[in-house]
From Swiss-Prot:
One of its GO terms (molecular function) is catalytic activity. The modification Phosphoserine is found at S77, S105. This is Protein angel homolog 1. The keyword Isomerase does not apply. The keyword Oxidoreductase does not apply. One of its GO terms (cellular component) is cytosol. Keywords: Phosphoprotein. The lineage of its organism: Eukaryota, Metazoa, Chordata, Craniata, Vertebrata.
Length: 667
């Protein structure tokens, strides 16, 4: 209780004592400041020269009291120096200093000095213009706080500027400080482009100063005047010329499902509307006669791609992937150049077969070229065009080989002519295999020994998962129930055609001469002596019955080779997969920043003897001749344009474009 009383009594007394002591020391400090022998202050606060006449100073002080004392405001908000008694004591101490002062400047100096003392005391800072005095500690607080301007009636021409305000004016006017000023914070925008994928941060727009047209320029390589592999010059006869493009256009759904592959891209260039406009410009620029597309999203195809391509003069066929997949393959052709003979969609999914449980598809079209009327009575062989997108998984090379075998069997059936030969063939698409891989060599060379080969090696794609588990290919690669031989042909295509009437030879019928059924007397047979009354004697060693398997017509048997698959389509690649002018490989895509070739255009060519080389088959132009191609780019060039996709190419693949010529023969 006593402690509480002492607390409430002594605390106010201590505060009062502290207030009085602070006021006293403040006045004393100001008096010493005025008496300081420092150099004169320049500017508006310059002091008049001091003289020895102290009586004149007292007279001036008395005059100031009579004229301005009654008009000086006294408010509690101005601090201790605003008190009338403290101001009077401060002025008295200031006048104790002997010196002669000018009467005209005394009044002006006194009023401004008092205002500056008040401002300095309020901020607890030393007078900034007096030299030789040690600065006091700065008060913690915001430097740029707004302080109202204080003025008095008799000091209307001199406002009290706080120290922070003066510093602010100096900051704005000093060009040296402005040069080092911090950049202003960006203002919030109403619309900000955001990533279309969750969990990704916003990136700055791509630098538009990149010359995409110059970096990504692709040359057209003309082979129309070059000799073929045997050194034979190109023929001068008429040709049916056409161009074909193969393009994986990157389905939007697949891009969003694998968003981590496109972190290097600005979100604006990944927008489908932007990509669709770019793709259509590419189609219009190159204007191919046949267009083979992969990763075509179904809703985009029916709503945008098919109507737009139809307006460009194309007739399109589309095959969506099986299952719940939303993309597929499309083949488009110009009806002014070709007439459709047949279209065959190919599904690689086979229920019950673990090897073929994937949803990839393909399309095979048989087209008849339309010869211009000016060439007269001439004919051109049909053209078989196959388009596919093979499984990506690098670890399942067995699945890729089985899918390719199904496609080749379908091509063999569609392209086979009545004499057993094949019409010209073009096979293109995204095969998800690199050049010189076993799958690539199988398509080009027509043969592959796969028994014991690790599955991850088939496509040649970089993948280290095989180190944990190696799946090796075993013969036979696919079961006989698939109906495809090891020569990649349908079993039904290899059967000789049967007629409805059965034909039996004499030797075959004589085998039934002494069988049990032949030796029995038919019921109701009229008995005639010497004719129907005798029973034939069966010779020794003659079988009493004929087994069913002996009389049934045997199905043709196709022996399966041990660990080897073949095909007889004689395909070769349009591209060489190497850029001699750059000394580096060609690139059609850049997954995870690694450039590689996985897209191809194969076409049928005639094989010829290779006396100097035994590793690769040497081909020459046949009915189908390669006239030109659009060059590919290197990995270094694509990285200079920030990879794929970019503002110039709106897919993660480059398009492939080739020009062909077909022989025109007289009927």
């Amino acid at each position: 209780m006593i402690a509480s009383c002492l607390y409430y009594l002594l605390l106010p007394a201590a505060r009062l004592f502290r207030f009085l002591s602070d006021a006293f020391f403040t006045c004393r400090k100001n008096a010493l400041l005025a008496k300081s022998s420092s150099p004169q202050v320049e500017g508006n606060f310059a002091m008049a020269p001091r003289g020895p006449d102290q009586e004149e100073c007292e007279g001036l002080l008395q005059q100031w009291r009579e004229e301005g004392w009654n008009q000086t405001p006294s408010t509690a908000s101005e601090g201790p120096l605003a008190d009338k008694g403290l101001a009077e004591s401060s002025l008295a101490l200031l006048m104790d200093n002997s010196g002669e002062q000018d009467a005209a400047s005394e009044d002006k100096w006194s009023s401004r000095q008092l205002s500056d003392l008040r401002a300095a005391e309020n901020l607890n800072q030393p007078f900034p213009e007096v030299l030789g005095e040690e600065p006091l500690a700065e008060v913690e607080g915001p430097l740029w706080a707004a302080v109202p301007v204080q003025t008095g009636p008799q000091y209307a021409d001199c406002a009290v500027l706080p120290m922070g305000a003066m510093a602010a004016e100096q900051w704005e006017e000093d060009p040296a400080m402005v040069a080092w000023s911090i950049a202003p914070e960006p203002m919030p925008q109403e619309e900000t482009s955001m990533w279309p994928f969750e969990g990704l941060e916003q990136l700055q727009p791509p630098p538009m100063e990149i010359p995409y047209h110059e970096i990504l320029w692709r040359e057209w390589e003309d082979f129309s005047t070059q000799p073929d592999a045997q050194g034979l010059e190109a023929g001068d006869g008429p040709q049916f010329q056409f161009t074909l493009m193969s393009y994986n256009i990157l389905a939007q759904d697949l891009m969003q499902q694998s968003s981590e592959l496109y972190l290097h891209c600005h979100p604006d260039i990944l927008n489908w509307n932007y990509r669709f406009a770019n793709l259509m410009q590419e189609f219009q620029h190159w204007d191919p006669d046949i267009l083979c597309l992969q990763e075509v999203q179904e809703d985009h195809y029916w709503e945008q791609l098919e109507p737009s391509l139809r307006m460009m003069g194309f007739t399109c066929f589309y095959k969506r992937r099986t299952g719940c997949k939303t993309d597929g393959c499309a083949v488009c052709y110009k009806p002014t150049r070709f007439r459709l003979l047949c279209a065959s969609p190919v599904e690689y999914f086979r229920p019950g077969l673990e090897l073929l449980n994937r949803d990839n598809v393909g399309l095979v079209l048989l087209l008849q070229p339309l010869v211009p009327e000016g060439l007269g009575q001439v004919s051109v062989a049909p053209l078989c065009v196959a388009n596919t997108h093979v499984l990506y998984n690098p670890r399942r090379g067995d699945v890729k080989l089985a899918q390719m075998a199904i496609l080749l069997a379908e091509v063999d059936k569609v392209a086979r002519l009545s004499d057993g030969s094949h019409c010209p063939i073009i096979l293109c698409g995204d095969l998800n295999s690199v050049p010189d891989s076993p799958l690539y060599n199988f398509i080009r060379d027509g043969e592959l020994q796969y028994n014991g080969m690790p599955a991850w090696k088939v496509s040649g794609q970089e993948d280290f998962s095989h180190q944990l588990y190696q799946r090796k290919l075993q013969a036979p690669l696919w079961p006989s129930s698939l109906g495809i031989t090891d020569c990649c042909q349908y079993v039904t295509s290899c059967h000789p055609k049967r007629s409805e009437r059965l034909k039996y030879g004499r030797d075959f019928l004589l085998r039934f001469r002494f069988c049990d059924l032949a030796c029995q007397r038919p019921v109701g047979l009229v008995l005639m002596e010497g004719v129907t009354d005798t029973k034939p004697d069966r010779p020794a060693g003659w079988a009493e019955c004929i087994f069913e398997e002996e009389i049934s017509e045997l199905e043709p048997v196709f022996p399966r080779t041990i660990g080897t698959i073949q095909h007889c389509l004689h395909l070769t690649s349009v591209y060489t997969h190497f850029l001699p002018q750059h000394g580096c490989p060609e690139v059609t895509t850049m997954p995870l920043g690694l450039g590689m070739t996985v897209d191809y255009i194969f076409f049928s060519a005639e094989s010829c003897e290779n006396e100097n080389r035994t590793d690769h088959r040497l081909d020459r132009d046949g009915t189908l001749k390669l006239l030109g191609r659009l060059s590919l780019l290197s990995e270094e060039i694509l990285w200079a344009a920030n990879g794929l996709p970019n503002p110039f190419y709106s897919s993660d693949h480059l398009c492939l474009l080739a020009s062909f010529g077909m022989e025109v023969t007289a009927p």
